[in-house]
Structure formats: structure tokens, C-alpha cells
Swiss-Prot record:
GO terms, molecular function: flavonoid 3'-monooxygenase activity; heme binding; iron ion binding
Reactions listed under catalytic activity: a 3'-unsubstituted flavone + reduced [NADPH--hemoprotein reductase] + O2 = a 3'-hydroxyflavone + oxidized [NADPH--hemoprotein reductase] + H2O + H(+)
Official protein name in the record: Flavonoid 3'-monooxygenase CYP75B3
Pathway connected to this protein: Secondary metabolite biosynthesis; flavonoid biosynthesis
Cellular compartment(s): Membrane
Signal peptide boundaries: none
EC number(s) per entry: 1.14.14.82
Residues that bind heme: 461
Its biological purpose: Catalyzes the 3'-hydroxylation of the flavonoid B-ring to the 3',4'-hydroxylated state. Catalyzes the 3'-hydroxylation of apigenin to generate luteolin.
UniProt source species: Oryza sativa subsp. japonica (Rice)
Induction: Induced by light.
Membrane topology: Single-pass membrane protein
Length: 526
């Protein structure tokens, strides 16, 4: 994806710089008596004219912000164009924001992605906090993410994972892109729950590759700090070409969502649902509510087709690639650490045996596998920087003044590598989470701010429970079902572990592996 590098924009901004400084000082940017009596703003680096600190972020902003935290402390301030940005880079500071001031930071700041991709804020992820947002979240919880819904859909998850494993067992002599295989599984599983049927063949095919490319492109675009969002005078220029790419990508997604809806309207039925009956999948429920003109929230707002498309877009993007990329990172780490892989396989053999695949009922009896998942989330959080939040009112955090309208970013990646919280933070050591160890009671569900891959507070990921079950079941089944060798004779010590930054944390080089079945043939159903 070609995005214009920020430093190349500076030559055309010289005049703007002079104007910006003039306006700044005319407005009293140097402060007055009242300002001097208030709490100080958090410290931070000096920025460029007009663009502020945007050019200093580099191609991996979470790395840059981690380094800045070492220099300025766990709470520091940046300026993105006209926007004040505060970054939380430690568990105690994150807790003050996301627990102590959660209500004040319950909204998102305006951004191009929400406008041009997410149906102008009509989705769940970027919708303003309020009755409509709560109603959308309740719908998802009731039909997908509640304990009852998760239990009802257990057979769907286990069935799709079994199909993935069967397909891999047939390819044991071939090199496979593990992330792609995991993405097909995650997408088909979610599709059966949301629209009632698979969207890809089990072996993926061209459609699956195209869809993954679309999701990766969306996450890359969403991870770009778009100059137009922070310098309003330059918005119309779209100097990085980000908005134009977003609009093109939105049209592709919109065609996809329209296809799902039109197919259902034309009478196509979900798997296992008789003609003329509504299915229990989310799309059936939403279309029924729309046709019956049921109210979406207490304000009398009714659900629209655009609402449905926006919600499906959230689910098919946030709920697929995050899962598959985490599974890919987990297997990469296990291949690099064969002793950890063998320990996990020994536990699985003891609990499950070699005559069947893992089921979800096995997972609570697999403490070492659970530790592997937690350690993978720690080193490779799917969202390294939290989605931004906005201060509704001025507040005080850690002795500093946080101005009204400031954007909050939580560096999830840096917090999970904080040496004051995690001994040997750069080492992959699942044993740190085992019973009797220092982090035995840490979970990933938002209560322990040292490990928040799904976020925390009222804007925590709505699909946390689904995502955690999928990542754990997929990883457990792959570890149990196969021994793994790297493709093309590569050795584990040479495995590329570089990151490719986006809104989600991708591998720079896809993991190419050869699966070698290790269970009884009957376990695979082949």
C-alpha cells in the first residue's frame, strides 16, 4: 500500500507553518496567569511546524512511543497537527484513564476511517457513546457473545476448526501459509454465526485471499495517522492519498455486505434452516427487526440497512484477522521454542489423548496451553495501540492536566513489555503465567492493566469472549494435531519475527510451514 511519507510533505507546508505560529501566539499560546496556576500538561517532545510530532512516529508508532515513554515517562504528550494527544504507557497510568476516568473517555475522536469506511460512524466500533451504541452492543452480546450464545455456537466453532485441521492433514507434504488457513477458518466460523453460512471453501481459494488482502489493507489504512484528520486545512488535499484509498475499499466492502443482505432477501436460507423460516444467525435477527420496524434504542431510532451493513463490516474485519494473526504469532513462537511446543503437546496428549481432536470442554484443563495464549497476547497484541478515545472534559491523571478534547492512546504493546512489571519482558516465557508464579492470576479480560490485548473499560472489545475462545481452540488444536517444520528448509533460529504495523499487528513475512500429523488417522476424519 503506497502512502506518501510525511517528511515529503514538509516542503509544501512552509507557508502554513508561519500562519500556524502566528495564530498560536495571537491566541495566547504562551499562556496567562490562569494557565500558570493549573496543573502542568504532560511532558513530551517538541514537534514540527504544522504537523507536530506526526513525522517523528516512523513506520512502527508503537515502538516510537515506547522509546518516548522511556525518555518522558509513562504519561506523555504529543501534538498531531492541531490535536493534543496523550499516551499511556504503563499499567498504573492506563488504569487511571480506563478505570478512574472511563466515562470521560468513552467517545472516539473524529477520523477519516469512521467517516469513509465505517458508514459515517454508524457502526459499533466508532459510534458515539450513548443509547444507540448500547443497543448495538446489546444486540451483539445477546446473539453472539453472551455465555448462552457462545455455548449455542460451540458446535460451529469446533466444526470449522476440525475442517481446517482435516484440510491441513491432507496437505502434510505441502507448504502452507498458516495465517491464510487460520483466516479462512476464523472467517467461516464467524460467517456461520452472523449470516448463517460459510463464505469460503474450506481450502480458501482466490476469494479468501482477496478478502484477507482487503482486511489487511483496511487495518493498514486505519493504522495510518492521516494528516487530514489533524490539520483541517489540508483535509481537502488528502496529501497521503489515504481517504481516496478508503473510499475505494469501502465500495468493495459495501458490495460484499449488500451481497449478504440481498441474498437473504431473495430467499436464500442459512445452513439447516427450512425455507420460510428465520434462522438464528445475527443477520436474520437484524433483518427481522428492520422489517418489523422495531426500535433500536430508547430514543425511538429504528434499525436501518446501513446499520446492519456497518455492524457486519465490524464483525468481518475486527473478528477475523485479529484471531488469525494471533494464532499465526503463537505458532511462530512455538516453532522458535521447541521446548515450549513439546511441553504444550505433552499436556494436550495427557488431557485429550491422541484419538480425537481438542474440544472446548478440554480448555479449562490445559493450564500450560492457557499460559501459551497469554504469553502470545503479551508479546504480540493484535492491536498494539488502542483505538483512540477523546476527553469529554478536562481531568487530572498522574498529577498532569489532560485538556478537554485531548485524544488518548494506550500503548498496549509497550505496557506488556514494561520491565518494571514483567521480568525478562522480551523473552517468550509462558511459564510466568503458571500456578504459583508471579503472574498466575493475570487474565486478558480487561481487569489486569498490564495485559489488555482486548482493551479495557466500557469500550473494551465487544467480541472478547468469542475471540479468546477461537484463538485458544485453534491454537490448541493445531499444537495437538501436528508437529511443525518450516518450509524450504528454514531453521527456527532464522525465522523472521518482524512486525508489519497497522491497526492490527501482522507478521511482516507470512509463516510458511509444513504440518506433520501426530494423532491417530481417525482423529482427523480423513
Amino acid at each position: 500500500m503506497d502512502v506518501v511519507p510525511l517528511p515529503l510533505l514538509l516542503g509544501s507546508l512552509a507557508v502554513s507553518a508561519a500562519v500556524w505560529y502566528l495564530v498560536y501566539f495571537l491566541r495566547g499560546g504562551s499562556g496567562g496567569d490562569a494557565a500558570r496556576k493549573r496543573r502542568p500538561l504532560p511532558p513530551g517532545p517538541r514537534g514540527w511546524p504544522v504537523l507536530g510530532n506526526l513525522p517523528q512516529l516512523g513506520d512502527k508508532p508503537h515502538h516510537t512511543m515506547c522509546a518516548l515513554a522511556r525518555q518522558y515517562g509513562p504519561l506523555f504528550r504529543l501534538r498531531f497537527g492541531c490535536a493534543e494527544v496523550v499516551v499511556a504507557a504503563s499499567a498504573p497510568v492506563a488504569a487511571q484513564f480506563l478505570r478512574g476516568h472511563d466515562a470521560n473517555f468513552s467517545n472516539r475522536p473524529p477520523n477519516s476511517g469512521a467517516e469513509h469506511v465505517a458508514y459515517n460512524y454508524q457502526d459499533l466500533v466508532f459510534a458515539p457513546y450513548g443509547a444507540r451504541w448500547r443497543a448495538l452492543r446489546k444486540l451483539c452480546a445477546l446473539h453472539l457473545f453472551s455465555a448462552k450464545a457462545l455455548d449455542d455456537l460451540r458446535a460451529v466453532r469446533e466444526g470449522e476448526v476440525a475442517l481446517m485441521v482435516r484440510n491441513l492433514a491432507r496437505q502434510q507434504a505441502a507448504s502452507v501459509a498458516l495465517g491464510q488457513e487460520a483466516n479462512v477458518c476464523a472467517t467461516n466460523t464467524l460467517a456461520r454465526a452472523t449470516i448463517g453460512h460459510r463464505v469460503f471453501a474450506v481450502d480458501g481459494g482466490e476469494g479468501a485471499r482477496e478478502f484477507k488482502e482487503m482486511v489487511v489493507e483496511l487495518m493498514q489504512l486505519a493504522g495510518v495517522f492521516n494528516v487530514g484528520d489533524f490539520v483541517p486545512a489540508l483535509r481537502w488535499l488528502d496529501p497521503q492519498g489515504v481517504v481516496a484509498k478508503m473510499k475505494r475499499l469501502h465500495r468493495r466492502y459495501d458490495n460484499m455486505m449488500n451481497g449478504f443482505i440481498n441474498e437473504r432477501k431473495a430467499g436464500a436460507q442459512p445452513d439447516g434452516v427450512a425455507a420460510g423460516e428465520h434462522g438464528n444467525d445475527l443477520l436474520s435477527v437484524l433483518l427481522a427487526r428492520m422489517q418489523e420496524e422495531q426500535k433500536l434504542d430508547g430514543d425511538g431510532e429504528k434499525i436501518t440497512e446501513t446499520d446492519i451493513k456497518a455492524l457486519l463490516l465490524n464483525l468481518f474485519t475486527a473478528g477475523t484477522d485479529t484471531t488469525s494473526s494471533t494464532v499465526e504469532w503463537a505458532l511462530a513462537e512455538l516453532i522458535r521454542h521447541p521446548d515450549v511446543l513439546k511441553e504444550a503437546q505433552h499436556e494436550l496428549d495427557t488431557v485429550v489423548g491422541r484419538g480425537r481432536l481438542v474440544s472446548e470442554s478440554d480448555l479449562p484443563r490445559l493450564p500450560y496451553l492457557t499460559a501459551v495464549i497469554k504469553e502470545t497476547f503479551r508479546l504480540h497484541p493484535s492491536t498494539p495501540l488502542s483505538l483512540p478515545r477523546e476527553a469529554a472534559e478536562e481531568c487530572e491523571v498522574d498529577g498532569y492536566r489532560i485538556p478537554k478534547g485531548a485524544t488518548l492512546l494506550v500503548n498496549v504493546w509497550a505496557i506488556a513489555r514494561d520491565p518494571t512489571q514483567w521480568p525478562d519482558p522480551l523473552q517468550y516465557q509462558p511459564s510466568r503465567f503458571l500456578p504459583g508464579r508471579m503472574h498466575a492470576d493475570v487474565d486478558v479480560k480487561g481487569a489486569d492493566f498490564g495485559l489488555i490485548p482486548f482493551g479495557a473499560g466500557r469500550r473494551i472489545c465487544a467480541g472478547l469472549s468469542w475471540g479468546l475462545r477461537m484463538v485458544t481452540l485453534m491454537t490448541a488444536t493445531l499444537v495437538h494435531g501436528f508437529d511443525w517444520t518450516l518450509a524450504n528448509g528454514a531453521t527456527p533460529d532464522k525465522l523472521n519475527m518482524e512486525e508489519a504495523y497497522g491497526l492490527t499487528l501482522q507478521r511482516a513475512v507470512p509463516l510458511m510451514v509444513q504440518p506433520v500429523p501426530r494423532l491417530l488417522p481417525s482423529a482427523y476424519g480423513v
